[in-house]
Design a protein with these regions (language model features):
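N-terminal glycine/serine-rich phosphate-binding loop of ATP-dependent small-molecule kinases
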Residues: 1-36, 64, 93, 167-172
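Carbohydrate-associated surface elements
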Residues: 43
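Active-site core segments that coordinate phosphate-bearing ligands/cofactors
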Residues: 47, 54-66, 72-113, 119, ...
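Hydrophobic transmembrane-helix microenvironments that flank and shape a buried ionizable site
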Residues: 19, 40, 176-178
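Short linear loop/turn motifs
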Residues: 148-157, 268-272
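Short acidic loop-to-helix transition motifs that present clustered carboxylates
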Residues: 20, 153-160, 180-183
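A structural motif corresponding to the C-terminal end of an alpha-helix
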Residues: 140-147
Length: 294
């Protein structure tokens, strides 16, 4: 960041953070050092735990409260795994956060421990209608609220940069949003019915559904698109999302794993040479399918 700012020649007026969403970092608040490797959004090590929970009465509660399905993709079982299998002893000094919280903590030298609803809504711990951490879900997964970040509006005051960085201190951090919601906003999808689809590692289609929390739709996720703080008046916009875990990553696998192509553009030539698939299809379910099958 310092190299980019130095080349620009001016300090920014404000900083915004966008990030991959469900990835979880655990760190010590006193030392600001991680206490375990991050568990990324594609990590499926808690699959059995999720299958066990699906046999309980928790499934409909999670669906209606968080807007999500019970899947290892989301952060709750990752945090639970870090506590139980990663042997992280809970204390007031332990912090769990998505990547935005970790970046914010470091940019402010530990003075700000916060997130926004677009990230909180991906943890499977957050009530997307009441806009708060859900006590029942915290108890189920053995997590205490003091170990989680405060949830602030997506556009608002999160803190200021500290003197511990090589660029100027005192730059306000005024926005946080998960990457897919930031993409929806960046494409000016401001009206209900507006949608975007991102093709990257996976593919993620989000549609703005307005300011009413949507009822669950089979195969899709209900999520927070963004919250806006307009001089103390908080407005929330919701979205429906379809998440496909592996699309572009499959092309990367063909290149780097199977090595059947040297560069991505070679794939088009191979595809055009094939007159028929003979009913053979490739389903890139390397980390599960995502929508609509889960």
């Amino acid at each position: 960041m310092s190299e980019v700012l130095e080349a620009h020649g001016k300090d920014p007026v404000a900083i915004g953070i966008t990030n991959q969403r469900e990835t979880i970092v655990a760190w010590n608040k006193k030392t600001s050092l991680p206490v375990h490797r991050a568990l990324v959004w594609q990590d499926r090590r808690t699959s059995k735990r999720c299958l066990d929970l699906q046999k309980t009465d928790l499934l409909p509660f999670i669906r209606t409260t968080t807007g999500l399905v019970l899947d290892p993709y989301f952060s709750a079982t990752k945090i639970e795994w870090l506590i139980n299998e990663g042997e992280i002893a809970l204390s007031p000094d332990v912090a769990f956060g998505t990547i935005d919280s970790w970046i914010l903590w470091n940019l402010t030298n530990g003075s700000a421990f916060a997130t926004d609803p677009t990230n909180a809504s991906r943890t499977m711990l957050f009530d997307i209608e009441r806009m708060k951490w859900d006590e029942r879900l915290l108890n189920v997964f053995g997590i205490t609220e003091e170990n989680l970040p405060a949830v602030l509006p997506s556009s608002g005051q999160f803190g200021i940069t500290s003197t511990s960085h090589s660029f100027a201190a005192g730059i306000p951090i005024t926005g946080i949003a998960g990457d897919q919601q930031a993409s929806l906003f960046g494409h000016a999808a401001f009206a209900a019915g507006d949608a975007k689809n991102t093709y990257g590692t996976g593919s993620f289609i989000l549609m703005n559904v307005g300011q009413e929390c949507p009822e669950p739709v089979d195969g899709l996720l209900s999520t927070v698109a963004w919250t806006i703080d307009n001089d103390g008046e908080i407005s929330t916009t919701y979205a429906l999302e379809g998440s496909i875990f592996v699309t572009g990553a499959a092309v990367q696998w063909l290149r780097d794993g199977l090595k059947i192509i040297d560069k991505v553009s070679d794939l088009e030539k191979l595809a055009l040479e094939c007159e028929t698939t003979d009913d053979v299809y490739f389903v890139p379910a390397f980390t599960g399918l995502g929508s609509p099958w889960w």
